[in-house]
Design a protein with these regions (language model features):
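Short helix-capping segments at alpha-helix termini
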Residues: 20, 134-136, 157-162, 235, ...
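Conserved SAM/SAH cofactor-binding pocket of Class I
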Residues: 96-206
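A short N-terminal interaction module
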Residues: 1-58
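Conserved beta-strand segments of alpha/beta enzyme cores
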Residues: 84, 138, 164-166, 264-267
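Conserved AdoMet
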Residues: 33-108
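Active-site beta-alpha loop architecture of Rossmann-like, nucleotide-cofactor-dependent enzymes
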Residues: 72, 195-198, 249
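Mobile active-site "lid"/loop adjacent to the S-adenosyl-L-methionine
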Residues: 194-224
Length: 280
């Protein structure tokens, strides 16, 4: 048998050597996941012993993290808007800054029965969160990845909103060509891929483990904003709103794209660091 305290100490030392941020916290999160308990219960009884299988599993996960493999892929879940979402390496990991987008939809929604489209839904974190906070909304999430759609459907079932959230596996470019012109939306929302080709070499190492299809957006990083603007011009209801997440440095270019489609720019929302993170 092996004491939790000693295993954690060793893991923290190893994570520190690899410059992993918050090594103590991350080691505790990994151990809690292995033992299927929360961190509070873990910390109450650090002298508890675990078996060899649990020890091996813990050390395997710590070794993965030392290679910059994302923590949330290791534990298979990520909290977003206070909701726990199941994730896998097949989906983009939900980011805290995307909560600004969801909060803006909730704040601006005036119609209890709004029709909302989430483009590039991933694990469904945006669509499912909106459904939880706007009970009457009719939401469609679209993604090109079959595995993403499977996980999104699982998350909608876990949150009991699958009757109001429909997920479609399709290429957005094909979807926008074939959609009935009468099926317009009150909100079109998206956290689209926005990494430019020239920016890839500057990304944090752990981001390379995430699906490239969820990151890459052409050489200038603006491909999907152009497509979303074109789609919005045709499929937004009168007084409808398109709300998109921004990169830290692309707000002016994105705003120009929508203005060039004769769509009125309303505002941007800044994130915790003062970057313009959401455009309405």
């Amino acid at each position: 048998m092996f004491k939790i305290k000693k295993l954690l100490q060793k893991a923290i030392e190893n994570l520190k050597k690899k410059n992993i941020p918050q090594p103590e916290l991350e080691a505790q999160i990994i151990m809690a996941n292995v033992l299927n308990c929360d961190r509070i219960h873990l910390l109450i009884d650090l002298d508890k012993e675990i078996n060899k299988n649990q020890k091996n599993k813990f050390e395997k996960y710590v070794n993965l993290r030392m290679k910059n493999y994302p923590l949330f892929y290791i534990i298979g879940k990520k909290e977003f808007m206070g909701i726990e979402f199941i994730i896998s390496p097949d989906v983009f990991i939900p980011r805290q800054e995307t909560e600004f987008l969801v909060e803006e939809v909730i704040r601006l929604n005036k119609n209890r029965n709004s029709r909302i489209l989430d483009i590039g839904t991933g694990c469904g974190n945006i669509a499912v969160s909106i459904a939880k906070f706007i009970p009457g909304a009719d939401i469609t999430g679209i993604d090109i990845s079959k595995k993403s759609i499977e996980i999104a459907r699982l998350n909608s079932k876990r949150q009991n909103v699958c009757d109001r959230v429909k997920f479609i596996c399709d290429d957005f470019l094909r979807f926008k060509k074939n959609l009935n012109i009468n099926k317009r939306f009150d909100f079109i929302v998206s956290n689209p891929p926005y990494v430019a080709g020239s920016e890839f070499k500057f990304l944090q190492r752990e981001i390379f483990y995430e699906p490239r299809i969820a990151l890459y957006a052409g050489e200038d990083g603006l491909f999907f904003y152009r497509e979303i603007a074109d789609f919005s011009k045709k499929y937004l209801k009168r007084n409808g709103l398109t709300i998109v997440e921004l990169s830290y440095n692309n707000s002016e270019k994105v705003i120009d794209i929508f203005r060039n489609m004769d769509l009125r720019f309303i505002k941007t929302v800044k994130d915790y660091f003062g970057f313009e993170r959401v455009a309405v």
